[in-house]
Amino acid sequence: ADEPISMLDMSVRAKILGLLTELKQDLGLTYVYITHDLASARFFCDRIAIMYLGKIVETGPTAAIFDNPRHPYTKALLRAVPDPDPSHGMARDLPRGEVPDASDPPPGCPFHPRCPEAVPHCGWEMRDVRMVLEQRWTRVSPEQFASEARVVGDASLFNQPEPSPGVGALRPATGSADELLALLEDERASDPAEPLWHGVRGMASNGREVRMEFIERAVPRLLPVVGSAVEVSCHLYHKPVPAESEAATARTK
């Protein structure tokens, strides 16, 4: 059932869920219930699979997912569920930025650009640098923004092919590469807790461009969490295996 109660009045939603439940009990049916409505999924489903950009990031019994969500995206989804209790307030630590283009997803963990708990191996790249700079520009004066934006240039410059795996290059639109490097160093110093910087092995100017070397990216795998009935695809729970290491292992088999 794909979004069977989406955009319906609450009374109609309840009737449809009640009918589906009756049919399940009377006929022994099994449903694949696709929805963005986690509240109804909690009521209706025995097991839940949370997906992001078409990939399952966490799956397990419904009670286990709701009582102790593991994946940062699952946590964010559950915080966003409306709560009628005014003492709980509104969730303000929801994922930053926009959902990426599914046809060109981020490398490594596709959720990492928006994740508050991202780690060095999550798959950092130059597009993430652009997002961090855009966040910076919400905090500075209009004059400083205009000056820095002239140096950085258009967003498309951050989408250039990597000169080599795990290495990004950015040429300044105006000014010098040293100016661009100074801007990046200033941002790293002003916000050292930003997850991106934990994934940067080094950055330097060669006079023409700034080159940034990122820590080897690893694609998380959906694996069981020890001591639970849940499987999660997240480096916070399983040791990252960089793509280069996986490729080397495959060649030796």
Regions found by a protein language model. Name each.
Residues 3-4, 8-90:
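P-loop NTP-binding/switch modules centered on Walker-like glycine-rich loops
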Residues 61-233, 237-251:
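Charged, flexible cofactor/metal-binding loops and thiol motifs
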